[in-house]
Amino acid sequence: MPPFAPLHVWRRRWLIRLAFYTFVVLVAVPLAFSQVLLRGAAQPPSAPPPGYVAGSVLSQGLRLRTWTRRGSDARPAVVIVHGLGDSLESYVDRADVFARRGHTVLLLDLRAHGASEGGYTTLGGHEREDVQAAMEALRGEGRAGAGLVLMGHSMGAVAVLRAAVGQPAVRAVVVEAPYDNYRANVFHHAWLLYRLPRWVPIIPITIAIAEWRAGFRADDVDAVRASASFGAPLLAIADGADMRMPEAVVRRVADAHAGPHQVWVAPGAEHVGAILHPDYWRVVLSFLDASGC
């Protein structure tokens, strides 16, 4: 028996190894990373606080949880949408402020979050339909006669911006920490969290796998394009210490807007933390007053 394997045996071994490593880099790792993009945050339902009524809306065959507090039909109804990994419970404090102003308020659990159905999140892709389902529910109940105000945070900000397009009933939109578009957001977070540069092929392959698994088009999820496609007044809030959706990204979304818009930067605020700033409600409510809401 020779001390070394023949050349053709070594060549075959190296080809097998190359095929294995290629599979890992181009298939297995992107498949695992796609789950990071698609992972929601389901949790058991809780009872609504006093004054709120638990309900649901149907979006693309998925049953989504809502909490609604009824107000005056003379005020625009408000839809409040959470961000990635969150649920409607976190936004009751915001809803209470609007309720005290007389607004009907609807809190929504997006798909694959909270107590809503769904296996995947699409970071504002299919979630547009979730927001529009909530809007339609308010219209169906006769609660949107004075129009609608949409408020979204992070992923929810992208969802409400996209949901506002082609909706004349939308009177004003408030967004905090939106990203500009799906691909740019994934590239940014790949570097921020994993130090993966843009040229690494894992990232576009991961996006393609996520598109295939969840049935959406990443290029459709574009908050800048959505902002340019409706004219209702827009308040864009940037969190001053936010590394995920920095001020420059928020301004890019706002500067593209087709109608009146303003940007407020909450100094020192972390991601979706502007509400902790003492000027938060002064800014938000002054904007709504100026918008006739």
Where do the model's predicted regions map?
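An N-terminal hydrophobic leader/cap segment in hydrolases
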Residues: 2-58, 64-67
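Conserved alpha/beta-hydrolase
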Residues: 95-117
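Short beta-strand/loop motif that positions the catalytic acidic residue
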Residues: 229-231, 236-238
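Catalytic histidine-centered segment of alpha/beta-hydrolase-like enzymes
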Residues: 269-281
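Hydrolase active-site cap/lid region
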Residues: 163-216, 273
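Conserved alpha/beta-hydrolase "acid-adjacent" motif
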Residues: 243-249
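Alpha/beta-hydrolase active-site loop
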Residues: 121-142
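Alpha/beta-hydrolase fold nucleophile elbow
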Residues: 142-154
